[in-house]
A protein has these predicted regions:
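N-terminal Rossmann-like dinucleotide/flavin-binding domain of flavoprotein oxidoreductases
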Residues: 43-95
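Short Gly/charged-rich anion-binding patches and loops
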Residues: 18, 37, 65
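Beta1/beta-strand and adjacent pyrophosphate-binding region of the FAD-binding site
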Residues: 2-15
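Gly/Ala-rich phosphate-binding loop of Rossmann-like dinucleotide-binding domains
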Residues: 20, 24
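A secondary-structure boundary/capping signal
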Residues: 13, 34, 78-81
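Glycine-rich FAD pyrophosphate-binding loop
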Residues: 8-10, 25-44
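Residue-level preference for short coil/turn positions at secondary-structure junctions
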Residues: 3-5, 26, 78, 90
Length: 95
């Protein structure tokens, strides 16, 4: 599949989701690639109480809300493993 993005974020944990939200909100074409599960390790956490603006939630709920917010701004998501990166002129190619 060949598609052009302004940014490809490798890793769909909280940091990757935050980056996707901000970049997509700024109207960048964003793809998040995660090899296992969007949300990462925090999805198995039953109690999240230290996330800014959130009094208490669980990891699954937090990251599903983050994904929805990123998607609402236009970010795309793909479940697959990145096997390589290469530089070809002005372009970066993700395999």
């Amino acid at each position: 599949m060949e598609k052009m993005y302004d940014a490809i974020i490798v890793g769909g944990g909280p940091a990757g989701l935050s980056a996707a939200i901000y970049m997509a909100r700024a109207r960048f074409r964003v793809l998040v690639i995660e090899k296992e599960k969007i949300g990462g390790q925090i999805t198995i956490t039953s109690e999240v109480v230290n996330y800014p603006g959130i009094l208490m939630t669980d990891g699954e709920n937090l990251t599903s809300q983050m994904r929805r917010q990123a998607e609402n701004f236009g970010a795309e998501f793909m479940i697959t493993e990145v096997t390589g990166l290469e530089l070809e002129g002005d372009y970066k190619i993700v395999h």
